[in-house]
Protein backbone atom coordinates (compact mmCIF):
# COMPACT_ATOMS: atom_id res chain seq x y z
CA UNK A 1 0.00 0.00 0.00
CA UNK A 2 3.02 2.29 -0.03
CA UNK A 3 2.81 3.08 3.66
CA UNK A 4 5.81 3.59 5.86
CA UNK A 5 6.90 0.70 8.11
CA UNK A 6 7.31 1.37 11.81
CA UNK A 7 10.73 1.65 13.36
CA UNK A 8 11.33 -0.85 16.11
CA UNK A 9 11.95 1.93 18.64
CA UNK A 10 8.50 3.44 18.03
CA UNK A 11 6.50 0.38 19.07
CA UNK A 12 6.21 0.27 22.87
CA UNK A 13 3.10 -1.81 23.60
CA UNK A 14 1.65 -3.77 20.69
CA UNK A 15 -1.77 -5.38 20.73
CA UNK A 16 -2.45 -8.21 18.27
CA UNK A 17 -6.03 -8.70 17.07
CA UNK A 18 -7.27 -11.36 14.63
CA UNK A 19 -10.82 -11.24 13.26
CA UNK A 20 -10.36 -13.32 10.13
CA UNK A 21 -10.65 -16.89 11.41
CA UNK A 22 -14.16 -17.25 12.85
CA UNK A 23 -15.53 -19.06 9.81
CA UNK A 24 -14.45 -21.34 6.97
CA UNK A 25 -15.61 -20.85 3.39
CA UNK A 26 -15.89 -23.83 1.05
CA UNK A 27 -15.95 -22.71 -2.58
CA UNK A 28 -16.90 -25.33 -5.17
CA UNK A 29 -15.88 -24.52 -8.73
CA UNK A 30 -18.60 -24.51 -11.36
CA UNK A 31 -17.45 -24.18 -14.98
CA UNK A 32 -18.31 -20.76 -16.39
CA UNK A 33 -20.54 -20.51 -19.46
CA UNK A 34 -19.73 -17.03 -20.66
CA UNK A 35 -21.25 -15.14 -17.73
CA UNK A 36 -19.07 -12.70 -15.82
CA UNK A 37 -21.03 -13.46 -12.66
CA UNK A 38 -19.29 -15.74 -10.16
CA UNK A 39 -20.83 -19.17 -10.78
CA UNK A 40 -19.13 -20.96 -7.90
CA UNK A 41 -21.08 -22.53 -5.07
CA UNK A 42 -20.14 -21.07 -1.69
CA UNK A 43 -20.82 -22.49 1.75
CA UNK A 44 -19.74 -20.84 4.99
CA UNK A 45 -19.25 -22.75 8.23
CA UNK A 46 -19.11 -20.78 11.48
CA UNK A 47 -16.47 -21.95 13.94
CA UNK A 48 -16.73 -21.94 17.71
CA UNK A 49 -14.05 -21.14 20.27
CA UNK A 50 -12.63 -18.33 18.08
CA UNK A 51 -11.91 -20.70 15.21
CA UNK A 52 -8.48 -19.96 13.80
CA UNK A 53 -8.22 -16.51 15.39
CA UNK A 54 -6.50 -17.80 18.51
CA UNK A 55 -3.91 -19.62 16.38
CA UNK A 56 -3.39 -16.61 14.11
CA UNK A 57 -3.01 -14.28 17.09
CA UNK A 58 -0.36 -16.48 18.69
CA UNK A 59 1.52 -16.89 15.41
CA UNK A 60 1.51 -13.12 14.91
CA UNK A 61 2.67 -12.54 18.48
CA UNK A 62 5.66 -14.83 17.92
CA UNK A 63 6.71 -12.92 14.81
CA UNK A 64 6.03 -9.51 16.38
CA UNK A 65 8.27 -10.29 19.34
CA UNK A 66 11.09 -11.02 16.91
CA UNK A 67 10.41 -7.86 14.90
CA UNK A 68 10.07 -5.56 17.92
CA UNK A 69 12.11 -7.23 20.70
CA UNK A 70 11.90 -4.22 23.01
CA UNK A 71 8.12 -3.96 22.80
CA UNK A 72 5.54 -5.60 25.02
CA UNK A 73 3.34 -7.73 22.75
CA UNK A 74 -0.02 -9.15 23.80
CA UNK A 75 -3.14 -10.60 22.24
CA UNK A 76 -6.39 -8.63 22.41
CA UNK A 77 -10.07 -9.22 21.73
CA UNK A 78 -11.76 -5.99 20.63
CA UNK A 79 -15.05 -6.99 18.99
CA UNK A 80 -16.56 -9.63 16.70
CA UNK A 81 -15.47 -9.55 13.06
CA UNK A 82 -18.94 -8.63 11.81
CA UNK A 83 -19.02 -5.57 14.08
CA UNK A 84 -15.60 -4.38 12.92
CA UNK A 85 -16.48 -4.87 9.24
CA UNK A 86 -19.92 -3.27 9.51
CA UNK A 87 -18.54 -0.35 11.47
CA UNK A 88 -15.85 0.41 8.90
CA UNK A 89 -13.13 0.56 11.53
CA UNK A 90 -10.38 0.25 8.93
CA UNK A 91 -10.66 2.22 5.71
CA UNK A 92 -8.84 4.86 3.66
CA UNK A 93 -5.61 4.12 5.54
CA UNK A 94 -7.24 5.15 8.82
CA UNK A 95 -8.28 3.22 11.93
CA UNK A 96 -11.52 4.63 13.31
CA UNK A 97 -13.06 2.39 16.00
CA UNK A 98 -15.87 3.49 18.32
CA UNK A 99 -14.81 5.93 21.02
CA UNK A 100 -15.25 3.30 23.75
CA UNK A 101 -12.79 0.95 22.02
CA UNK A 102 -10.27 3.72 21.46
CA UNK A 103 -10.52 4.78 25.11
CA UNK A 104 -9.93 1.19 26.20
CA UNK A 105 -6.80 0.90 24.05
CA UNK A 106 -5.42 4.17 25.35
CA UNK A 107 -6.23 3.24 28.96
CA UNK A 108 -4.36 -0.05 28.48
CA UNK A 109 -1.34 1.82 27.12
CA UNK A 110 -1.55 0.20 23.66
CA UNK A 111 0.59 2.29 21.32
CA UNK A 112 0.16 0.11 18.23
CA UNK A 113 -2.13 -2.59 16.87
CA UNK A 114 -1.42 -5.47 14.54
CA UNK A 115 -4.85 -6.16 13.03
CA UNK A 116 -5.61 -9.29 10.96
CA UNK A 117 -8.77 -9.08 8.84
CA UNK A 118 -10.28 -11.01 5.94
CA UNK A 119 -9.33 -9.98 2.40
CA UNK A 120 -11.35 -10.60 -0.77
CA UNK A 121 -9.55 -11.13 -4.07
CA UNK A 122 -9.60 -13.09 -7.30
CA UNK A 123 -9.12 -16.84 -6.93
CA UNK A 124 -5.52 -17.52 -7.93
CA UNK A 125 -4.57 -20.91 -6.52
CA UNK A 126 -1.11 -22.43 -6.66
CA UNK A 127 -0.95 -25.62 -8.69
CA UNK A 128 2.36 -26.99 -9.98
CA UNK A 129 3.87 -23.51 -10.38
CA UNK A 130 0.77 -22.12 -12.10
CA UNK A 131 -2.27 -20.18 -10.90
CA UNK A 132 -5.74 -21.61 -11.48
CA UNK A 133 -9.24 -20.90 -10.21
CA UNK A 134 -12.31 -18.82 -10.92
CA UNK A 135 -14.39 -16.33 -8.99
CA UNK A 136 -13.26 -14.73 -5.74
CA UNK A 137 -12.05 -15.96 -2.36
CA UNK A 138 -12.07 -14.35 1.08
CA UNK A 139 -10.69 -15.28 4.47
CA UNK A 140 -9.87 -18.91 5.22
CA UNK A 141 -11.25 -21.93 3.46
CA UNK A 142 -11.07 -24.53 0.75
CA UNK A 143 -11.51 -24.35 -3.01
CA UNK A 144 -12.85 -27.56 -4.56
CA UNK A 145 -12.44 -28.30 -8.27
CA UNK A 146 -13.92 -31.60 -9.45
CA UNK A 147 -13.17 -31.09 -13.15
CA UNK A 148 -9.45 -30.49 -13.64
CA UNK A 149 -7.33 -33.69 -13.74
CA UNK A 150 -4.35 -33.33 -11.38
CA UNK A 151 -1.55 -35.80 -10.66
CA UNK A 152 -0.06 -36.53 -7.27
CA UNK A 153 3.45 -35.12 -7.14
CA UNK A 154 4.84 -38.09 -5.20
CA UNK A 155 3.30 -41.02 -7.09
CA UNK A 156 2.18 -39.57 -10.42
CA UNK A 157 -1.29 -41.01 -9.85
CA UNK A 158 -3.99 -39.04 -11.67
CA UNK A 159 -7.02 -37.75 -9.80
CA UNK A 160 -10.13 -35.99 -11.07
CA UNK A 161 -9.93 -32.57 -9.47
CA UNK A 162 -8.07 -30.99 -6.56
CA UNK A 163 -8.56 -29.41 -3.15
CA UNK A 164 -6.90 -26.08 -2.38
CA UNK A 165 -6.70 -24.72 1.18
CA UNK A 166 -6.47 -20.91 1.03
CA UNK A 167 -5.78 -17.96 3.33
CA UNK A 168 -6.78 -14.55 1.99
CA UNK A 169 -6.26 -11.91 4.66
CA UNK A 170 -4.74 -8.52 5.45
CA UNK A 171 -2.25 -7.55 8.14
CA UNK A 172 -2.26 -3.89 9.16
CA UNK A 173 0.08 -2.14 11.60
CA UNK A 174 -1.76 0.75 13.21
CA UNK A 175 -0.60 3.65 15.35
CA UNK A 176 -3.35 4.02 17.94
CA UNK A 177 -2.72 7.72 18.59
CA UNK A 178 -4.10 9.36 15.48
CA UNK A 179 -5.38 6.13 13.94
CA UNK A 180 -2.75 5.97 11.19
CA UNK A 181 -2.18 2.75 9.27
CA UNK A 182 1.62 2.62 9.14
CA UNK A 183 1.93 -0.52 7.03
CA UNK A 184 -0.44 -3.03 5.46
CA UNK A 185 -0.04 -6.22 3.47
CA UNK A 186 -2.71 -8.24 1.67
CA UNK A 187 -1.98 -11.96 1.52
CA UNK A 188 -3.38 -14.52 -0.93
CA UNK A 189 -1.77 -17.85 -0.04
CA UNK A 190 -2.84 -21.33 -1.05
CA UNK A 191 -1.69 -24.91 -1.49
CA UNK A 192 -3.22 -27.82 -3.40
CA UNK A 193 -3.77 -31.57 -3.20
CA UNK A 194 -4.86 -33.90 -6.00
CA UNK A 195 -8.06 -35.89 -5.58
CA UNK A 196 -5.82 -38.94 -6.00
CA UNK A 197 -4.69 -38.43 -2.40
CA UNK A 198 -8.11 -39.46 -1.15
CA UNK A 199 -8.73 -43.00 0.02
CA UNK A 200 -10.81 -43.71 -3.08
CA UNK A 201 -9.29 -41.07 -5.35
CA UNK A 202 -12.75 -39.93 -6.41
CA UNK A 203 -13.67 -36.77 -4.51
CA UNK A 204 -11.09 -33.98 -4.07
CA UNK A 205 -12.68 -33.03 -0.73
CA UNK A 206 -11.26 -36.30 0.62
CA UNK A 207 -7.72 -35.46 -0.53
CA UNK A 208 -7.05 -34.24 3.03
CA UNK A 209 -8.57 -35.65 6.20
CA UNK A 210 -9.96 -33.25 8.84
CA UNK A 211 -6.69 -32.99 10.77
CA UNK A 212 -4.76 -32.37 7.55
CA UNK A 213 -7.21 -29.65 6.53
CA UNK A 214 -6.64 -27.82 9.82
CA UNK A 215 -2.87 -28.25 9.56
CA UNK A 216 -2.85 -26.94 5.98
CA UNK A 217 -4.60 -23.71 6.97
CA UNK A 218 -2.34 -23.26 9.97
CA UNK A 219 0.75 -23.65 7.78
CA UNK A 220 -0.50 -20.97 5.40
CA UNK A 221 -1.24 -18.56 8.24
CA UNK A 222 2.07 -19.12 9.99
CA UNK A 223 4.22 -18.93 6.85
CA UNK A 224 2.56 -15.75 5.58
CA UNK A 225 2.88 -13.98 8.93
CA UNK A 226 6.53 -15.01 9.13
CA UNK A 227 7.05 -13.50 5.69
CA UNK A 228 5.28 -10.15 6.05
CA UNK A 229 5.62 -9.02 9.66
CA UNK A 230 9.42 -8.53 9.43
CA UNK A 231 8.76 -6.28 6.42
CA UNK A 232 6.78 -3.90 8.61
CA UNK A 233 9.90 -2.54 10.28
CA UNK A 234 12.76 -0.58 8.75
Description of each model-found segment:
Residues 30-149, 153, 166-170, 174-184:
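N-terminal segment of the mature soluble domain
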Residues 1-25, 124, 129-234:
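C-terminal/domain-edge helix-coil "capping" segments
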